[in-house]
Amino acid sequence: FLNCTLERTPRLSHTETLIKNVAQKVFEANGVTTKIIRPVDYTIAAGLELDMATTPEWAKDDWPQIEKEIDAADIVIICTSVWLGEKSSVATRVLERMYGYTGQLNDKGQSHDYGKVGATIITGNEDGIKHCAMNILFSLSHIGFTVPPQADAGWVGEAGPGPSYADEGSGGPENNFTNRNSTFLAWNCMHLARMLKDNGGIPAHG
């Protein structure tokens, strides 16, 4: 899970609470090893080079550390809060850096993220789940990930200022729609990842 919250560790992340409440539990109950990474804890340079620290513009770039985690994963879930109806600025930076690696090819000559499964989990206290999911899932597909059915899940409160997911009385953790969709997401990711793994990924023919 790439939790693109704006909150650095150890501050509370409502998005991370949703991750842990449902999808992570489903994965781990079925033998899938998981890891939650907060990109905001790292120095992620702007740009599309593999390592921006090799350019004159940036003295430090932690993105290669995160890219190693992505490379090792079969399933990558971009998780974000909603701000002004959009995914977080951290999520945008993450997707930009992932896009910068599309020129790296696997042994079939495909973009190196072929054969990986992508999905998204979103929280907020305003509208925007479907809008954010539309952008994130397209971006993952364009980069080379395979997106399963119902690969988005999330929770938002009532319109206007109000409690966030993990706040007392929000109703978020008890929301049947959120819990159902998070469960569908986890299972569909596992099923598709297994299908891809068993069949050697996406055929290179054509």
Give the residues covered by each predicted segment.
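Amphipathic, positively biased hydrophobic alpha-helical segments used for protein targeting
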Residues: 15, 129, 135, 155, ...
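Short helix/strand-capping connector loops at secondary-structure junctions
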Residues: 157-174
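Conserved catalytic loop of SAM-dependent methyltransferase domains
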Residues: 43, 47, 156-161
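Short, glycine-/small-residue-rich phosphate/pyrophosphate-handling segment
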Residues: 13, 107-160, 177-180
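N-terminal beta1-alpha1-beta2 submodule of the flavodoxin-like/Rossmannoid cofactor-binding fold
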Residues: 1-108, 169-206
